[in-house]
Amino acid sequence: MITSKQRSYLRTLSNTLQPIFQLGKAGIEENFLKQIVGALESRELIKIKVLNNSGMTAREASDIICEAINAEAVQTIGSKCVFYKTSLTKPKIELP
């Protein structure tokens, strides 16, 4: 669990990020989750865009993804979600 101060710090870091995944009509599948886990391990902070044809809102997708991979939802605005998970091998981001 991250504090509100840490969440605020992560939000500032995520402002310049571009979404690296798009969630479409295929939905949240096991392969999609594996790709997210790999990206979080290497980057620690990622942004995902939820397309209109996915059949779910960004908040719903964020809740499902966080529960499935034990990540922290930093922010959900519009159709974009930001996730954070500390890397087990090489932590890059040092939280305040």
Q: What residue spans do the PLM features occupy?
A:
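Positively charged, polar, low-complexity stretches
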Residues: 1-96
